[in-house]
Amino acid sequence: MASQIAQLLEKALHFWNAVPQPLQYTFAALGALYVLRGALSFVRLLLNSFILSGPNLRKYGKKGTWAVVTGASDGLGKEFASQLASKGFNLVLVSRTQSKLDALAKELRLKWSGLETKVLAMDFSQDNDEDYERLAKLIAGLDVGILINNVGQSHSIPVSFLDTEKTELQSIVTINCLGTLKTTKVVAPILAARKKGLILTMGSFAGTMPTPYLATYSGSKAFLQHWSSSLASELAPHGVDVQFVISYLVTTAMSKVRRTSLLIPGPKQFVKAALGKIGLDSNENFPNTYTPWWSHNVFKWIIDSTVGNTSAFTIWQNRKMHVDIRNRALRKAAREAKKQ
């Protein structure tokens, strides 16, 4: 084996020596540039993940400025609301359940003296224009500086597109896409008029890599990626920062993951990173996009730098993983049905 390798190396060296010297220099330069690009990408990863911080949120408004948070009653939305309140922002909380919104608003007002809150119960899946009109009236005259587009829905369990219920398919697209766009359409003019503001939209690994058995959800997040990067360019002259946040799993009701780990943070950890890493672009394919949680960023960099996040191998692995998750979910449901 060793002798065969030595022979191959000898043949390669002989071939290289036969190449004209100008071409050797050209190939060597291209190779050096490729290695340099990889090294710079790795340095950027380390700086953005462990050393650099984003701007102070005061960039978007003084104490008492308002922040609009959608999907605010649970999970990441609830944590965004809590951490923005801790930084002196008043809150407009938008979600489906009135009782949860009222409870959260009361909890935060008791915790943070002087905090003002407004709540709006609306079901984004209904795509009711009257709801967006109510939102516009609610925030009219407020000094809104931040919009957190957090509302979203995934599939209840991984499922093939052919077996996806029509109602689930429609709900995912309506909430994730139309809900985000229509909310932004209401809030963005206020941010542009005041010449400063932040629009932060939640993305997903599923939007950066095609994800079989979550096809509709994956497509909705990919749509938001392109929309967000386009919107960022449009609103930059108005002083509005538009940022798209990439995340892997976080312990939320939507992810159905209960335990934190090295790769899976809790909402508090993730939101702290998301608000602290604004503007630190870590996705070289799309500007104004960042992956705030360090292990998510490292994981994504490894995939991007090796097999590629849209390669056939990555899609195959994604399919295999989600078929397994589906099968385990179905077995669990069958066991619970027997108990009843």
From Swiss-Prot:
What the entry lists under InterPro entries is as follows:
3_ketoreductase_fungal (IPR027533), NAD(P)-bd_dom_sf (IPR036291), Sc_DH/Rdtase_CS (IPR020904), SDR_fam (IPR002347)
Biochemical pathway: Lipid metabolism; fatty acid biosynthesis
* TM annotation in the entry: 23-43
Q: Which UniProt keywords apply?
A: Endoplasmic reticulum, Fatty acid biosynthesis, Fatty acid metabolism, Lipid biosynthesis, Lipid metabolism, Membrane, NADP, Oxidoreductase, Transmembrane, Transmembrane helix
| Catalyzed reaction equations | a very-long-chain (3R)-3-hydroxyacyl-CoA + NADP(+) = a very-long-chain 3-oxoacyl-CoA + NADPH + H(+)
Please provide, in alphabetical order, the Gene Ontology terms of the cellular component aspect for this entry. Answer: endoplasmic reticulum membrane
Similarity comment? Belongs to the short-chain dehydrogenases/reductases (SDR) family.
Q: What is this protein called?
A: Very-long-chain 3-oxoacyl-CoA reductase
Report the source organism. Answer: Podospora anserina (strain S / ATCC MYA-4624 / DSM 980 / FGSC 10383) (Pleurage anserina)
